[in-house]
């Protein structure tokens, strides 16, 4: 059975672990516990063939900047995550996450993933953002950044409601199996 390695990166507390747990178990975790490193595996059928989708969760916190890239070798696709209600996490996509994965894995495709979309219209969240003269990141703005950074695609989801959740992983699988404008199956190698 062929394995697809998918590594999830992004700032701490943007919902990377919730995304993975909600997708793999259909349950939303009740408390926040920062991740050091975790992995999950699910079997998916693609064109009648079974594949193992290996999902690698990483720590977003700066303390792990030197440790995190150790999970990058042989990656088939990255999910670069930010919270649509945390504008700083969106800025870090350009400032930190895409440069980091591009440095270690320049040929590996990635998707830009906007998380926590259920909070985009939440009155309490909108009020909190407004106090800081901020607003949620719109779909258009996410798509524009994805195009600028040459992501395969921009996708959004809510791990809480599962809206768009399956689509994130379907698109990741497609990107891994058919990387656009590149030779097939360029994997990340760290020398």
Swiss-Prot record:
Residues 189-191 form a propeptide. The keyword ATP-binding does not apply. The modification Cysteine methyl ester is found at residue 188. PROSITE patterns: RHO. Disruption phenotype: RNAi-mediated knockdown disrupts tail tip morphogenesis resulting in retention of the pointed larval tail tip in adult males (also known as the Lep phenotype). RNAi-mediated knockdown in distal tip cells (DTC) causes additional turns during their migration. RNAi-mediated knockdown in addition, causes a truncation of excretory canals associated with the formation of cysts and a reduced distribution of Golgi and ER components along the excretory canal length. Keywords: Cell cycle, Cell division, Cell membrane, Cytoplasm, Endosome, GTP-binding, Lipoprotein, Membrane, Methylation, Nucleotide-binding, Prenylation. It comes from the Eukaryota. SUPFAM superfamilies: P-loop containing nucleoside triphosphate hydrolases. GO terms for molecular function: GTP binding; GTPase activity; protein kinase binding. It is a lipid-anchor. Plays an essential role in spindle orientation and organizing cellular and embryonic polarity by controlling the localization and activity of PAR (partitioning-defective) proteins. Required for maintaining the asymmetric cortical localization of the anterior complex proteins par-3 and par-6, the posterior cortical protein par-2, and pkc-3. Involved in hypodermal cell fusion, together with pak-1 and ced-10, leading to embryonic body elongation, which involves dramatic cytoskeletal reorganization. NCBIfam families: small_GTP (TIGR00231). This is Cell division control protein 42 homolog. It comes from Caenorhabditis elegans. The gene is cdc-42.
């Amino acid at each position: 059975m062929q394995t697809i390695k998918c590594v999830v990166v992004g700032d701490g507390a943007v919902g990377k672990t919730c995304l993975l747990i909600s997708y793999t178990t259909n349950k939303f975790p009740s408390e926040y516990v920062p991740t050091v490193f975790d992995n999950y595996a699910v079997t998916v059928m693609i064109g009648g063939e079974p594949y193992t989708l290996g999902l690698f969760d990483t720590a977003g916190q700066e303390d792990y900047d030197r440790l995190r890239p150790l999970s990058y070798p042989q990656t088939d696709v990255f999910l670069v995550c930010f919270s649509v209600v945390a504008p700083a996490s969106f800025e870090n996509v350009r400032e930190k996450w895409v440069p980091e994965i591009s440095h270690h894995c320049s040929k590996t495709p990635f998707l830009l993933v906007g998380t926590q979309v259920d909070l985009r219209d939440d009155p309490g969240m909108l009020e909190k953002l407004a106090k800081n003269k901020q607003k949620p990141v719109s779909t258009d703005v996410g798509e524009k950044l994805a195009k600028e950074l040459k992501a395969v695609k921009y996708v959004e989801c809510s791990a809480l409601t599962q809206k768009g959740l399956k689509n994130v992983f379907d698109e990741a699988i497609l990107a891994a199996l058919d990387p656009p404008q590149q030779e097939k199956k360029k994997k990340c190698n760290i020398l």
